[in-house]
Amino acid sequence: MLKWLFKVLFKFNGWHLHTPSPVDARNCIMVAAPHTSNWDFVYAISALDQLGLSPRFTIKKEFSKFPILGGMITALGAIWIDRSPKKEGEKRLSMTQIMVSLFDTSKEDMSVLVTPEGTRSKVTNWKTGFYYTALEAKVPICLAFMDYATHTTGVGMCFMPTGNMEADMKIIMDYYKDVTPKYPSGFSTDIRYAG
């Protein structure tokens, strides 16, 4: 039901799909950028569904407490994550360890959608856990985009991380530097790797 509604909104607002999607996008870490609006999620889920992809995504477990909302978000592919502060002496896996474990134990291909900006507000340093996850899980990094200037969205390219993080991150920053977000003042590529 929700995916159907998202598709109606996608079409009604004039969005178009960039096709075809790389084959690697079925088992990957999928970077989604720019992320400056809650609408990005609606359009991204609709686009990826139309491309035949069913990515999973992480979300705070607190949202699962709302029965109807939690159920709908789970149906969209949510992976519930405990982001509460650790208690003294508590042992808990890092987000990267959790994600690698998901790939290692999955019996099917799995793509995990991540927004490395970590917020809809402008940041100049992206979170890099997605890179380490892809490297350790031995899965490609695929670059999904939403360009509000052209109303085009999709998965543009995939590549295997080489272990040379600086070089690989420069590829990612170069890819996103000309993509127009909904709110341009709220987006920046990671200045540490901008070419």
Predicted ranges, named:
Residues 12, 16-178, 192-195:
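Soluble catalytic domains of membrane acyltransferases
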Residues 182-193:
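Short, flexible loop/turn segments with low-complexity composition
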Residues 1-4:
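Helix-enriched interaction subdomains in cytosolic or periplasmic regions
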